[in-house]
Amino acid sequence: MIQQETRLKVADNSGAREVLTIKVLGGSGRKTANIGDVIVCTVKQATPGGVVKKGEVVRAVIVRTKSGARRTDGSYISFDENACVIIRDDKSPRGTRIFGPVARELRENNFMKIVSLAPEVI
């Protein structure tokens, strides 16, 4: 579960390495986000020469969480880290590569470009 002030690793090559959550989108009183949810973030660490700069406010979709997510068959999926992918307004990723596995829940939320770029879908 991701909430305000949570720091996440960025799992793409957009230039950002770490982001800080500002807001969870999807409802006025929504406090937490899980895999497949869109959040508003600020870039805290960035690589030189990247598309995204430090201090920039961006939107991102969560692709991995430590707390895990419950699936419809009753199983749970969890990862070793909290990670996100920076996206544009049309849900397409700003980077051209995705690093590490992503959860299958992204396919249900119509993030097909991220699913197709990912090396592994769990």
UniProtKB/Swiss-Prot annotation:
Provide a GO CC annotation, any one. cytosolic large ribosomal subunit
UniProt-listed InterPro entries: Ribosomal_uL14, Ribosomal_uL14_bac-type, Ribosomal_uL14_CS, Ribosomal_uL14_sf
Q: What is an example of a Pfam family matching this protein?
A: Ribosomal_L14
A GO MF label: large ribosomal subunit rRNA binding
GO terms in the biological process aspect are:
translation
PROSITE patterns assigned to the protein according to its UniProt record, in alphabetical order: RIBOSOMAL_L14
Presence of keyword Ribosomal protein: yes
Is rRNA-binding one of the keywords UniProt gives this record? Answer: yes
- Database matches in CDD domains: Ribosomal_uL14 (cd00337)
Keywords per UniProt: Ribonucleoprotein, Ribosomal protein, RNA-binding, rRNA-binding
Question: Cross-referenced NCBIfam families, in alphabetical order?
Answer: rplN_bact (TIGR01067)
The protein's assembly and partners: Part of the 50S ribosomal subunit. Forms a cluster with proteins L3 and L19. In the 70S ribosome, L14 and L19 interact and together make contacts with the 16S rRNA in bridges B5 and B8.
Cite the HAMAP family for this sequence.
Ribosomal_uL14
What is its biological role?
Binds to 23S rRNA. Forms part of two intersubunit bridges in the 70S ribosome.
Q: According to its UniProt record, which protein family does this protein belong to?
A: Belongs to the universal ribosomal protein uL14 family.
Q: What is this protein called?
A: Large ribosomal subunit protein uL14
Species whose genome carries this gene? Bacillus velezensis (strain DSM 23117 / BGSC 10A6 / LMG 26770 / FZB42) (Bacillus amyloliquefaciens subsp. plantarum)
